[in-house]
Every structure is written in structure tokens, then in C-alpha cells.
Amino acid sequence: VYAGGFLMAIGHFMMAFESMFFPALLFLILGNGLFKPNLVSQVGNLYKPEDARKDRAYMIYYMGVNLGALMSPLVCGTLGQKYGWHYGFGAAGVGMLVGLAVYHFGRKSLPADLVEQREAHRVNNTVAVHEPITKQDYTRIAALVFLCIVNVAFWAVYEQQGNTLQLWADSKIDWNVMGFLVPSTWYQSLNPVFILLLTPVITRFWLHQSKKNSEPTSVSKMGIGCLLLGVSFLVMYGCVDIIGAGKGSLWWLVGTVLILTAGELYLSPVGLSFVSKLSPLKLVSMLMGMWFMSSFFGNILAGYLGTFYETMGQKSFFMMLATVSLVAAVVFFVVNLPLKKLMHKDTDLEAPLVKS
């Protein structure tokens, strides 16, 4: 984590100089590869493998990531446009160093019982890391690979919000709100805003379900995420006829992104939690990287699907996206119970706890 953070900070500072652009990108790529999977796996290490609170912990982590994504264009973008991009990229480097400082000093603020628990786990984990991969581990890895493949379908549809949905919004939405012409680019801010608003709501809802022993398993939550994503594009399918040849209300877009974001929160952070629960200790970071790679392939597939936007027509295109999402949801729901058996877990993968 430290090495990755410092490499990214150096990369951001190098971006301030135009001649260093490509070496800076290399530093950012290498740094992100070290930083992201390892930090994510450490979130899981704060809890026991079967602890139901992991899903909610990753939700909080995910909210923090998106808070940074919301702030970065406001701070770095404003500095870049007003004072020059040297300052914008320099601010990003400073922000990375501030984040590392918070990470370093925050490690000393863990509760005493958690520190003792982590020390006990550290001893056990040291032994486990040197143990050979078992047949049970291989079956779990195979299950994770399968879920990563299904995850590609989710991201292929989800990433249309920055692609074809933006094109549709530019041409079919009336951006005039009470006499104020809203820049269409502001649409891209809806998703991080909704993540910040919905995260505490969904987290509390899961806690409420946990107290009643009705909290869904991680795989079921991911199925719900795909289901919500499909519903969001069914909304788009319906509004095409309602809007017709004219322009529609901005609320169509807001409602679609709201449902789409709820689907994201049911899948993305939960997927991170699921990988943390099932991965062999020596492979947690690598398998986290594999999970992130599924979104990479999802983005590639999203670009391919986007090529059908003009040729299929809007209604057929949105129905296709909804169908892909709903099929992925069905796959998640169907494999939920077999996966629990495949993972050799007699109890639920989450073993819901009342304590938040």
C-alpha cells in the first residue's frame, strides 16, 4: 500500500510536466496495481471471514472512494482550469500523500480488541500463507472465476451511463430547469452523489435485515444488483415512447441513474466482500485484482455494445441492455445455493450478525 501510494504520488507530480506524461502514466499504473487490491483486501482483514459486517464495511469503503471521485474534479479540475494544470496535477499528488498519512496514523487508532484480534489472526495467517493450496481452495477459486465472468456482463451494461446514456441525454433531455440551462456534463455527477446518499440507507437496511435473520447472501445481493440495473434500462425503454420525437424531463434521467446506482451498490462493494471471504489467504490480493479485471473486460464489452446504439434503434438497444442485466441476475440467483454447497460452507456465507 505504501509503495503503491508513493508511486502514484510521484506519477501525479510528474504529470505536472508535459514531457513526463508517459513515464507518469507508468508510475500511476504500477502504483494503482500495488495500492488498490492490497488496500481492499486489508478492509476484509478487519473482520473474521464469516462476519456479515464485511458487506457493510465495504459499502463504507466504497462511499469513501466515490467521495474522493466527487471531490477530485472540484479541487484538481478547478485549479487546473483557473491556474494551470501544473497546479491541478500537483494537488492530486499532495492529496495522495495526505491519504497515505491518514492511512499511516489511522492504523494506530484501531480499537484495542481489534488490535489483539489482528495479532492473533496474524500468527494464524502466517502459518496459513505457507500452506499449500487445497482442493477446497481450488473449487472456491473456480467459483470466483465464474462469478467474475458474470460480473463482466454487469459492467458492460452499467458503463453505458458514460457512453450511450450520455449521448441519449444530450439529444433527448430538456436541460432547462426553471430558466436555468443545466450543463449536460453535470449528468456524470449524479452517480457519485447518489452513491453518497444511498450508501447509508442501504447499509441500514441490511442491518435491519440482519437483525431479523433475513439479510440476503452476497451472491443474492449481486443478483439484486443486476436486477436493479435491468430495471433501470426498462425505465429507459419505456420513456422512449413517452418522450417520442420531442425532449423529455430531466427526471427520467435522474430516476434511471438512481435505480442504476442502487444496483451498483448491491453488486460492486459486495463483490469485494465476497472475494475477501472466499479467497485463500495467500491469494487474496491477486484474486481482488482478478475481480477488478472483470470490470476492465466489462468496459471493453460496453464499448462493443455501444456500437449498436445507432443501428438497433433506442428502444431495441435499451431492451437488449435490460435483457443482458436480467439474465445475469438469474444466473446469480440460480448459482446462489449450489455455490454455498460448493464452498463447503454448512452455514450461510454471511452468517448474519446483529451487531453493526
Show which residues each predicted segment covers.
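Helical-face signature of the major facilitator-like transporter fold
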Residues: 21, 25-33, 151, 155, ...
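Helix-loop junctions at membrane interfaces in 12-TM secondary transporters
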Residues: 14-25, 235-254
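Intracellular loop-helix junctions on the cytosolic face of multi-pass helical membrane proteins
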Residues: 49-50, 76-183, 202, 206-212, ...
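Glycine-rich segments within core transmembrane alpha-helices of 12-TM secondary carriers
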Residues: 53-81, 88-99, 188-195, 285-302
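Loop-to-transmembrane helix entry
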Residues: 53-60, 165, 172-197, 211-224, ...
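Cytoplasmic helix-loop-helix junction between adjacent transmembrane helices
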Residues: 33-63
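A membrane-interface helix-boundary motif in multi-pass transporters
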Residues: 78-94, 215-220, 248, 307-327
